[in-house]
């Protein structure tokens, strides 16, 4: 039986190839027919169709290849066809009977000829246990036969077989290993073959799931499979001889893991949150809950269905919401959502696989919390019909009245926040209403000054609204409008000048006492009987005065346009007007006097200093004129030289270049270097003209080849004369003398320090300072000593050269003084050690001076000592005569010890 099946598998591809060749041959002979080659196109789909999913391709035969065809679907809301004939889903929907069949139209653009074809959609069949068993009964897979050269003719080799997949259910209980199929080659009759499989699950991770008997070719599975981990295994079977040579081409073996319902649905979130506006109509979308199942989504094991288990609270209806059992969309099914009554609903949602079968399906639950959001279904209402307030005149940013409202909507939301609008009583826009964000009150504020003399009272009409419009069907009640009565309080206002500033035109040069104008102010308080007095506030040049009663302005000095206080021909003066109200108020006004120019300033030469060479060439001096007046009292100017002194015109000449410039040149061939003052007559063009003799200071200097003054001349020209140079030298000499005197003083001071003696005068008793050696406790008894003697002990002179009058006060010994070797001088006489050595030397030479031997007891250890005479003690090395003559060098204090060991009489 297995061999017959193998033969059929071998013949089937051959028959299919022959059939295809015959069809192609017949097609070439048959005539081409324009239109759809099929009457009905079929497609097998899963239950759910997704948006944009390609379904099938309808073929249209276009014989001449030049016709342009447009496709159209009979169900354009669900299906569309592109220009290549590919049919796509327009939207996502579950496949049902109403979508099972539709038409596709093809219309030619030129002739408008139209064709149609039917499309039939069917559901993909679900695998059952019987089909799984049937697929599992495949017992033997035979390697396809290979053809080769035979009888000298080259025959076509047949293609490899396509082995049908092996379907194996997951979670099988065994026993293991469980045999699946037997793989063999029909060449096993003549050869001893060995079989093996490769691929993931065999020799690749995860390894060891599938094994094969190398002798019999029996393929087995070693443990249960999990489709959620690996849904398909792709193995390759091999057949080799005992030498390892390949006998057959490898074949592909596909093992499909059949899904079992072993996974519960799992919600993406355990708690879902959604919102719905209050007052929503039935059918309003709320939210979508989603659960996933790890099982095959194309099988019943992964097809989920949703339902609502419970709703809390159950008012106003226990079924306020429903859920789409396939998509999980939650919508409203009843009216009556009111946030002011119920603000939140809690739903328990269940998801069940096996298309919701309560008997075989697995279930899981989640919680959906639906919050009822507020809409503007409650308008704001004023707490009173009329509000009152008052404001002083001319005040801005003042709160006049506080408007209060009530609103039942959710606080601090656009449906609760109030917006106030003035609908009447304020045509000029002097008031505004701002909303307090915390209390929702309306604050009536003055934004423009109010004049009591113009308006004494305002009656405003105010309307209250929300930031968002009211819900449909809700109207504003009369309580949403109120009246605000505002009373204006009269206050004393500032007097004001009109016009301000006031501009007048006057010629400069007016004499003192001239009345210029009257500058008066007005009092806006018409209902107050008040007097105004005037004072001068600012008069930079002190030219004016004002009458305190009538405001007449009179000059007290000559007006000068050229004054630095005049800017752009205008002089500014400020005056103050004050009333006698309570409290008194004042206002300022500015008087601007535009001064007309008169010819009161004579021109001056510019520049006032210049330099030129001793010879006329190559330099000339260009000059101009400076006139503080303006046209026509300024240029053009006339330049000339005076007749006196005669040397001016003899040495110089002036040439007028234009109305503003002239040129001064040397008239003689050589002029000695020096400073010359050249008078120049300059006349302006005023009426009458004004002349002036202006002095030009000219420096004549020696010039180089470029016509520039040399450095010596520039130094002279800079004003550094002989006197200045002498003064500088004297300062330098004095400074050097001071430095020299300081150096001499420092040298003398050092010599005085060196001349000081370490031992002071006889009348000063210093024995405590230099002869007390054994003091170890307490501080110094004598603090009165010269510290410099310790710092500079090198100034102490030897005894042989002590000056007369300085001697020791110690008592001289009664016997002759011994002679001691003179110690070498210290290498550093400035050290304090030299000071101590000198004192020690003096003490050694005078043994009778204190401290005395009877007082310097260093080895007293207390009475009652058991030790005998120290002369009886011998050292460890006293084995013979030793030389103790060196004790004589230790001084008179060790004389007795030297006599004891040296053999003296004592």
Swiss-Prot record:
Annotated GO CC locations? adherens junction; apical part of cell; catenin complex; cell junction; cell surface; cell-cell junction; cytoplasm; desmosome
Kindly list the positions annotated as binding Ca(2+) 1. 170, 226, 228, 262
Which residues participate in Ca(2+) 3 binding? 261, 263, 293, 301, 353
Carries keyword Transmembrane helix?
Answer: yes
Q: Which UniProt keywords apply?
A: Calcium, Cell adhesion, Cell junction, Cell membrane, Cleavage on pair of basic residues, Glycoprotein, Membrane, Metal-binding, Phosphoprotein, Repeat, Signal, Transmembrane, Transmembrane helix
Question: Localized where?
Answer: Cell membrane; Cell membrane, Sarcolemma; Cell junction; Cell surface
Binding of Ca(2+) 2, residues: 170, 228, 259-260, 262, 295
* Glycosylated position list: 190, 273, 325, 402, 572, 622, 651, 692
Q: What is its main location?
A: membrane
Q: Where are the transmembrane segments?
A: 725-745
What processing steps or modifications follow its translation? Cleaved by MMP24. Ectodomain cleavage leads to the generation of a soluble 90 kDa N-terminal soluble fragment and a 45 kDa membrane-bound C-terminal fragment 1 (CTF1), which is further cleaved by gamma-secretase into a 35 kDa. Cleavage in neural stem cells by MMP24 affects CDH2-mediated anchorage of neural stem cells to ependymocytes in the adult subependymal zone, leading to modulate neural stem cell quiescence.
Q: Where is this region: Disordered?
A: 863-884
Q: Which residues carry this modification: Phosphoserine?
A: 96, 135
| GO BP, sorted A to Z | adherens junction organization; calcium-dependent cell-cell adhesion via plasma membrane cell adhesion molecules; cell migration; cell morphogenesis; cell-cell adhesion; cell-cell adhesion mediated by cadherin; cell-cell junction assembly; glial cell differentiation
Residue intervals on the Extracellular side: 160-724
Give me the stretches of Low complexity compositional bias.
Answer: 863-880
Comment on protein domains: Three calcium ions are usually bound at the interface of each cadherin domain and rigidify the connections, imparting a strong curvature to the full-length ectodomain. Calcium-binding sites are occupied sequentially in the order of site 3, then site 2 and site 1.
Subunit structure, briefly? Homodimer (via extracellular region). Can also form heterodimers with other cadherins (via extracellular region). Dimerization occurs in trans, i.e. with a cadherin chain from another cell. Interacts with CDCP1. Interacts with PCDH8; this complex may also include TAOK2. The interaction with PCDH8 may lead to internalization through TAOK2/p38 MAPK pathway. Identified in a complex containing FGFR4, NCAM1, CDH2, PLCG1, FRS2, SRC, SHC1, GAP43 and CTTN. May interact with OBSCN (via protein kinase domain 2). Interacts with FBXO45.
Q: Which PANTHER family match?
A: CADHERIN-2 (PTHR24027:SF79), CADHERIN-23 (PTHR24027)
This chain belongs to which protein, by name? Answer: Cadherin-2
| Source species of the chain | Pongo abelii
Source organism phylogeny? Eukaryota, Metazoa, Chordata, Craniata, Vertebrata
- Which gene codes for it? CDH2
